[in-house]
């Protein structure tokens, strides 16, 4: 775990970089640059010929990248989604990469900066966009979406059992006045939640669901996993840290499917002797007790590693 002056506490820092098996002259991608915690550690292990590409949607991440690593010729940055990493690799004319790291979800600064609109703990404009210059804000969506759509998003992406009640409450509230503030939305969904989970804010699942929807996080993840595996060289590793069950299930299933290969119908007379495309590296890793005590956000972190054959 690393805490730096850029306001972000990096989860599973040593474990993630160790899992990549960084080679001094290797080519690597930090697909979720954030505030550069993982990138800084990867650069420590790279030699003069090694290269690291940082990717992030957030324009503030770009500014941080320039501040931290502008004098390091081994580091490059592209603002965008890791779902487009193959195009960045092609643009750089890299033959492939030796490792890709994805640290999913929202970063500490994004949560802690009220004006970004991610947090239900402090008041701010209801935005939630990783890239504030792209797409609908959360406020625009909750004020225009149909009740059925809101309910579906809360259920599918937040696994919120009171999704229908919350959607109904949101639609009723916006008829009185537009929903434009984070605490305004938090109060609406909390009031529609009759059974608060112990130790969890009643708005947690709703905010998670809306954030995932606004930023197309699961769509990006599905595409990003495919692209990451596609750009890996043989022997290259994909390391993914997820923070909620929806992400982790997708990562687990994708890695399992790659390792097992395509299913062949039992009735086909085919000898299944094709070499595997990939192998799992170890078991899933969780943050240790010491890290969780120091950073409660590490509690839900799960890391999985895949190596291309």
From Swiss-Prot:
Belongs to the methyltransferase superfamily. RsmH family. Keywords: Cytoplasm, Methyltransferase, rRNA processing, S-adenosyl-L-methionine, Transferase. InterPro entries: RsmH (IPR002903), SAM-dep_MeTrfase_MraW_recog (IPR023397), SAM-dependent_MTases_sf (IPR029063). S-adenosyl-L-methionine binds at residues 36-38, 56, 82, 103, 110. One of its GO terms (biological process) is rRNA base methylation. It comes from the Bacteria. SUPFAM superfamilies: Putative methyltransferase TM0872, insert domain (SSF81799), S-adenosyl-L-methionine-dependent methyltransferases (SSF53335). NCBIfam families: 16S rRNA (cytosine(1402)-N(4))-methyltransferase RsmH. Its EC number is 2.1.1.199. GO terms for molecular function: rRNA (cytosine-N4-)-methyltransferase activity. The keyword Lyase does not apply. HAMAP family: 16SrRNA_methyltr_H. The keyword rRNA processing applies. It is an enzyme of class 2 (transferase). This is Ribosomal RNA small subunit methyltransferase H. It is found in: Cytoplasm. Specifically methylates the N4 position of cytidine in position 1402 (C1402) of 16S rRNA. One of its GO terms (cellular component) is cytoplasm. Its main location: cytoplasm. It catalyses: cytidine(1402) in 16S rRNA + S-adenosyl-L-methionine = N(4)-methylcytidine(1402) in 16S rRNA + S-adenosyl-L-homocysteine + H(+).
């Amino acid at each position: 775990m690393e805490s730096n002056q850029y306001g972000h506490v990096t989860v599973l820092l040593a474990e993630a970089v160790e899992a990549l098996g960084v080679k001094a002259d290797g080519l690597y991608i930090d697909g979720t640059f954030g505030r550069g915690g993982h990138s800084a550690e990867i650069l420590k292990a790279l030699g003069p010929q090694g290269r690291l590409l940082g990717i992030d949607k957030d324009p503030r991440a770009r500014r941080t990248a320039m501040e931290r690593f502008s004098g390091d010729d081994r580091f490059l940055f592209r603002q965008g989604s890791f779902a487009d990493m193959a195009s960045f690799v092609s643009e750089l004319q890299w033959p492939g990469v030796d490792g890709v790291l994805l640290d999913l979800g929202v970063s500490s600064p994004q949560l802690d900066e009220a004006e970004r609109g991610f947090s239900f703990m402090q008041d701010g404009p209801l935005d939630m966009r990783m890239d504030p210059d792209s797409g609908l804000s959360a406020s625009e969506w909750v004020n225009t979406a149909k009740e059925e759509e809101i309910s579906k998003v809360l259920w599918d992406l937040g696994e919120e059992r009171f999704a229908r009640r919350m959607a109904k409450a949101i639609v009723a509230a916006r008829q009185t006045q537009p929903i434009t503030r984070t605490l305004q939305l938090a109060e609406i969904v909390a009031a529609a939640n009759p059974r608060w989970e112990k130790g969890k804010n009643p708005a947690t699942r709703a905010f998670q669901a809306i954030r995932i929807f606004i930023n197309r996080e699961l769509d990006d993840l599905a595409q990003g996993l495919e692209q990451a595996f596609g750009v890996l060289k043989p022997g290259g590793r994909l390391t993914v840290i997820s923070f909620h069950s929806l992400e982790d299930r997708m990562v687990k299933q994708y890695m399992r499917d790659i390792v097992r290969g395509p299913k062949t119908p039992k009735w086909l007379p085919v000898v299944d002797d094709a070499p595997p495309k990939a192998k799992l590296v170890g078991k899933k890793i969780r943050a240790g007790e010491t890290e969780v005590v120091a950073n409660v956000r590490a509690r839900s972190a799960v890391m999985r590693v895949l190596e291309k054959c």
